[in-house]
Amino acid sequence: MPLWTIYHPPGAFSDVDKAELAEKITDVYGAVMPRFYVGVVFQPLEPRNFYVGGKPADRFVRIVMEHIARSFPSLEASRRFIDRINAVLAPYIADRGYDWELHVDETPFDYWSINGHYPPRPDTDDEKRWRAENRPSARTHA
Amino acid sequence: MPLWTIYHPPGAFSDVDKAELAEKITDVYGAVMPRFYVGVVFQPLEPRNFYVGGKPADRFVRIVMEHIARSFPSLEASRRFIDRINAVLAPYIADRGYDWELHVDETPFDYWSINGHYPPRPDTDDEKRWRAENRPSARTHA
Amino acid sequence: MPLWTIYHPPGAFSDVDKAELAEKITDVYGAVMPRFYVGVVFQPLEPRNFYVGGKPADRFVRIVMEHIARSFPSLEASRRFIDRINAVLAPYIADRGYDWELHVDETPFDYWSINGHYPPRPDTDDEKRWRAENRPSARTHA
């Protein structure tokens, strides 16, 4: 469900950084949903292909987060979540002197499929099994 | 309208596979709308730039489908459509042992333009002409 | 806020073209919001990775515009804006014989963060300061 796209200057993150970041982002979501829901795409961009404010961006990280499995129940919940994400990102971005921007879009739960299955609703027995087994399987409840 | 982005391991699809997949995806939509509405982008991703569940993804295909020209009229219609898409994808993905995930987002019809034209509403005379000619042209109806 | 992704054939735009386009796009948004809100990503795509209507696309430019900071207040406002964008693009796309398609999606204002800040509402004193200084800073109003 969450699909992250991280646009970044080619030299911003090492392969180790990327693996760590993906793991830590997955930990945040994994506290409430199956870990295999979390996709993270890194898109290195040369400054000639990436502009912020009309200027080539060689110190900027832009993150797009598509949420499907969960909707924020309130503004406060979204603030807590985004603050936590900013804290996870800090050692890799802010602390290295990069600027960054992120936004979340929410897309329809019903128009989503994994390995041909339609994912179970949050906190159902089926989702609990998907989470425990960390893989999709046929639903046993409607 | 539909814009598909297919994130995949670099070796997952040959050029022939990609051309076939694009053709078959276009056939599905082309049954009800102009074929030239259908855009398909393949994005090969090295495992160090693509993580699922916090692990490098070398056997995973992630598909994002942006729908503009049509909204699903019902849950049942969306199920039929997504099941059909999963069947079209199977020989290229499931049958080769890849895991895959897809989701659809719907974006506003009115904020869409092709070659400077605003596309006609579904099933109007203008859309029928666009479809028959497989190209955009000035609208003759409001 | 606006994040543009411009999918284009590798040879469609020179580096000078890209810098000019990013500047002109930023000028349009900069008339009403901070210039640093504007992100533009160029994604060159080989024809074997980019299909329109089921055919490899070597003369097609596809633009995705994600809007966060402002929502269109009316259909008329969206038409004026998109017409203006099409006019800005024309010398680089239509006048060179390329086909093109664009669409706008609007995503939630509240789920957006820049350098750890939550951007101020349109036309507030805080936004005016962000615009005048062309950088984010701590909000002084709720």
For the regions a protein language model found, what residue spans apply to each?
Chain A
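A domain-level signal for the structural core that forms small-molecule/cofactor-binding pockets
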Residues: 1-142
